[in-house]
Amino acid sequence: VEMFGADSSTDAKVMEFLPETNIVIGAAKAGVQVLSKKQLGEAKNLLVAADVNAVPPVGIEGVGIHDMGVELPETPQNAIGLGALAIGDIKYKLHLKLFEMMKSADEPLYVDHNCAFDVAREIVSKL
């Protein structure tokens, strides 16, 4: 997996990375739209668009703040959208479960990223 941050300040800069991107996470400051539906239409390899901006306008046009795996028909591969509050809900459930695990353990429990990821997968599988 290759992850990188990208400049999305202009349409031209977005189009330098978006057509080959599989997953995009919109993480601009509140109230800034990072990607439009028109741009998403050029994202030929996009599978997931996650937006962590819950302040209007949303960061990724077409992804609602409560969306959990909603199909984005404007994308060539019908990518799925994840909204900020849906992401936050999973994060909350994950934190709660990890705290419960720590509280019920007989000995100190140290949780690393791999453990947290496994627990998150378990939570998401039940949605």
Predicted regions and their residues:
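Adenosine-phosphate binding glycine-rich loop
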Residues: V55-L127
